[in-house]
Amino acid sequence: MKRELDTADRKIVELLQEDARLPLKSIADKVSLTSPTVSARIDRLEKDGVITGYRASVNPEVFDYRIKAFINLEVEPVRKKEFYPYITDCPNVIECNCVTGDYSMLMEVVFHTTSELDQFIGQLQHFGRTKTQIVFSTSVEHRGIPLGDTRIPILEQEEEK
């Protein structure tokens, strides 16, 4: 059963999304609760599946991953049973999503070189046709999900002269 999160729970989740290493005392101060209360709330949020894990965000270039790409793959239905275990075992696949549209899968991948990427794409073509986009730059990194105001900002129109 879905449980509604109160303002304090939402603020705790928001703070942990920004910095999962934030000390309990800091969180407690920001939500005006005691550290034991915050600890109990975090435990409950984990138990209820609201918080599903904690990760370090790592700079791929430090590990010489210079190529980041998104690959669309149209998996042939008869190949899906063998595709899922294969893709799960590929460490260079950061994320793989089943999507709607012309392609059935969208993957985010990292590689050291374009030739490694090319070799991987060749392997993927065993499962179906691909379309690849290599990332030049990233304007918005992965971030936490929005918990507050989710209205899309309105662009101000320039006045016509």
Question: What are these language model-derived features?
Answer:
Residues 1-161:
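A compositional/biophysical signature of low hydrophobicity enriched in polar/charged and small residues
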